[in-house]
Amino acid sequence: MSGGRRKEEPPQPQLANGALKVSVWSKVLRSDAAWEDKDEFLDVIYWFRQIIAVVLGVIWGVLPLRGFLGIAGFCVINAGVLYLYFSNYLQIDEEEYGGTWELTKEGFMTSFALFMVIWIIFYTAIHYD
């Protein structure tokens, strides 16, 4: 018996219908990416919205923004950035995914709740006397 270890083979790339499967995150940044799976694209929209919520929550908390101006600013930026992403950058047909409104509201309330929590935590930690 030899004391050598077995060399593990690197994992093979995943195949989908005989073609190489492209990573979801590599498709996010490519404007010419094809989204065959509707749920995969909606997941990207959902998580992109959560990232925006965290970033804006931190910024709004560090800046002394309060009240309606902060909430309205979040809603406009969150919806606007995602609308520009899927309509102008990706240039997808919104009707394939349920229309513009369906994509605009995908994960919005969850991101709004996350934004509020992050905003309150940072604002309280920095500006509370």
Swiss-Prot record:
One Pfam family linked to the record: EMC6
InterPro entries listed in its UniProt record: EMC6-like, RCAF1
GO cellular component labels: endoplasmic reticulum membrane; mitochondrial inner membrane; multi-pass translocon complex
Annotated TM spans: 45-65, 67-84, 104-127
Top-level lineage group: Eukaryota
Cytoplasmic side, ranges: 1-44, 85-103
UniProtKB keywords: Endoplasmic reticulum, Membrane, Mitochondrion, Mitochondrion inner membrane, Transmembrane, Transmembrane helix
GO BP annotations, alphabetical order: mitochondrial respirasome assembly; multi-pass transmembrane protein insertion into ER membrane
Membrane topology: Multi-pass membrane protein
Disulfide bonds: none
Subunit record text: Component of the GET- and EMC-like (GEL) complex, composed of RAB5IF/OPTI and TMCO1. The GEL complex is part of the multi-pass translocon (MPT) complex, composed of three subcomplexes, the GEL complex (composed of RAB5IF/OPTI and TMCO1), the BOS complex (composed of NCLN/Nicalin, NOMO1 and TMEM147) and the PAT complex (composed of WDR83OS/Asterix and CCDC47). The MPT complex associates with the SEC61 complex. Interacts with NDUFS3, NDUFA4, NDUFV1, NDUFA9 and NDUFS8 of the mitochondrial membrane respiratory chain NADH dehydrogenase (Complex I).
Protein purpose: Component of the multi-pass translocon (MPT) complex that mediates insertion of multi-pass membrane proteins into the lipid bilayer of membranes. The MPT complex takes over after the SEC61 complex: following membrane insertion of the first few transmembrane segments of proteins by the SEC61 complex, the MPT complex occludes the lateral gate of the SEC61 complex to promote insertion of subsequent transmembrane regions. Within the MPT complex, the GEL subcomplex may mediate insertion of transmembrane regions into the membrane.
Family to which the UniProt record says this protein belongs: Belongs to the EMC6 family.
Protein name as catalogued: GEL complex subunit OPTI
Species of origin: Canis lupus familiaris
GN (gene name): RAB5IF
